Amino acid sequence: IDYIRRNNLNVRIGVFHMDYEIQYKMTIDYVDRMIEANKDIIDVYRVCVPFRVATCTSMYQSFWRPWEKGKKKLWVRPMPKDAMTEKDFPFYNTQMWDYQMRFAKWIHDKKDAVRTCCLIGIRTQESFNRWRCIYLNRKYQMYHTYRWTSKVANDVYNAYPIFDWKTTDVWTANGKFHWDYNILYDLYYR
């Protein structure tokens, strides 16, 4: 976003936000601030779909579903007004685990794109599964030879540009560039 603004580029970025219904209020506030501050250069896909989400908080279920219509009385908060729901996605079905991968292909086709790159903001320091995503030895399908990319579908790739950032890198960048951030991290620091 900073690069687009500094170089006065005439491009828009699609932002895919999987709204999980149950999130910290500070996280929701941060997402809303970022969307509002950048609406001139981003197209927002705020998705409120009852996709399967793995959980270890139940002895009876291996997954839960945010925004499940049949459990609307139990929703933690109202659905955002600008949300896209399951009716917006012809590929959605209740059995799928790979919603975000299918979304990438859907947006590629919808935009009639030549190539699509989805930027994913994960850091390998945060979890072993994230580390495996980048360093898996059997990683055959990358964009050119960039190890921090993965092919999702024909001409659709995920890229992980901050995969090697450490926690200190994140805070150094925030301090240097005065980026907005989720103030929930201030509470974690205390």
PLM segments and residue spans:
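Nucleotide-activated chemistry modules centered on ATP-dependent adenylation/adenylyltransferase
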Residues: 1-190
